[in-house]
Amino acid sequence: MSWIERILNKSNITQTRKASIPEGVWTKCDSCGQVLYRAELERNLEVCPKCDHHMRMTARMRLHTLLDEGSEVELGSELEPKDVLKFKDSKKYKDRLVAAQKATGEKDALVVMKGTLYGMPIVAASFEFAFIGGSMSSVVGARFVRAVEQALEDNCPLVCFSASGGARMQEALMSLMQMAKTSAALAKLQERGLPYISVLTDPTMGGVSASLAMLGDINIAEPKALIGFAGPRVIEQTVREKLPPGFQRSEFLIEKGAIDMIVRRPEMRQTLASILSKLTNQPQPHFDEAAPVSEQENQADA
């Protein structure tokens, strides 16, 4: 042992350790790369306060932030997917289901709840994109029909938040059949004269965009959401042409008249309440809370 080691051993020195930061405290914006405090991002409804990028949000969080606190009642939670075709690609479908259920805590890619919005009774549905890309299965179709039936029973509006890659290929024709099934259910809602508002979020593609997502009495999109049937890369490869900038994004679609409105997520709740109060001939709700404002909007106002 050297002389310096002997001195150090004799002295009562407290060793310093690196301060460990718990996992999940910080996250990074997918768009601008800004490092964000996780709790602050959640308070801002998963919208980056720096660049206003709308990150993906869980289905359950969407519904909890939409409906009045304590009013939520889940519908169709007993419906579970089954691998009736014994489908297998690079992985067995039943194994994909187990993995998706474990990762998301959901049984399938659509969550349905009834409740109130500023005191107005509504039924709301939301896709869970993290569950096999929010793909439409027979259970998703059945839950959506359950949502329509509940709206008919309660004589109230229906709101649906779409975030999906389209029909679930592992269920083949049974999945494609849900396009017709959900569209037929919405026709009953229209016959009754009950409002259906469709909110398209990033991404809304394939069979979902070709059915229930574009059948709203009013179609609202979040900023810069990708909305279409086939993706832009597939279209470019097929037509062998360069697509225009922003093709299939919300801003492009509203210019072409394909959607009715673009609404920021923090303003969505109040916007939906205002629209539904007018469509159902109810008094305009009184809004106490103010929607969060991004740094981009602050700079624009200045």
Swiss-Prot record:
Positions of region (Disordered): 281-302
Gene3D superfamilies per the UniProt record, alphabetical: 2-enoyl-CoA Hydratase, Chain A, domain 1
InterPro entries found in the cross-reference section: AcCoA_carboxyl_beta, Acetyl_CoA_COase_Trfase_b_su, ClpP/crotonase-like_dom_sf, COA_CT_N, Znf-ACC
Principal subcellular localisation of the protein: cytoplasm
Catalytic function, reaction form: N(6)-carboxybiotinyl-L-lysyl-[protein] + acetyl-CoA = N(6)-biotinyl-L-lysyl-[protein] + malonyl-CoA
Key words, A-Z: ATP-binding, Cytoplasm, Fatty acid biosynthesis, Fatty acid metabolism, Lipid biosynthesis, Lipid metabolism, Metal-binding, Nucleotide-binding, Transferase, Zinc, Zinc-finger
Subcellular location: Cytoplasm
Cofactor binding mode and count: Binds 1 zinc ion per subunit.
Enzyme class per UniProt: transferase
The protein's annotated pathway: Lipid metabolism; malonyl-CoA biosynthesis; malonyl-CoA from acetyl-CoA: step 1/1
Entry GO terms, CC: acetate CoA-transferase complex
Zinc finger (C4-type): 29-51
Any one GO biological process: malonyl-CoA biosynthetic process
Cofactors that this protein relies on: Zn(2+)
Start and end residues of each CoA carboxyltransferase N-terminal domain: 25-294
Coiled-coil parts of chain: none
E.C. number: 2.1.3.15
Entry binding sites for Zn(2+): 29, 32, 48, 51
Molecular function, one GO term: ATP binding
Subunit annotation: Acetyl-CoA carboxylase is a heterohexamer composed of biotin carboxyl carrier protein (AccB), biotin carboxylase (AccC) and two subunits each of ACCase subunit alpha (AccA) and ACCase subunit beta (AccD).
Homology family: Belongs to the AccD/PCCB family.
Function of the protein: Component of the acetyl coenzyme A carboxylase (ACC) complex. Biotin carboxylase (BC) catalyzes the carboxylation of biotin on its carrier protein (BCCP) and then the CO(2) group is transferred by the transcarboxylase to acetyl-CoA to form malonyl-CoA.
Protein name according to UniProt: Acetyl-coenzyme A carboxylase carboxyl transferase subunit beta
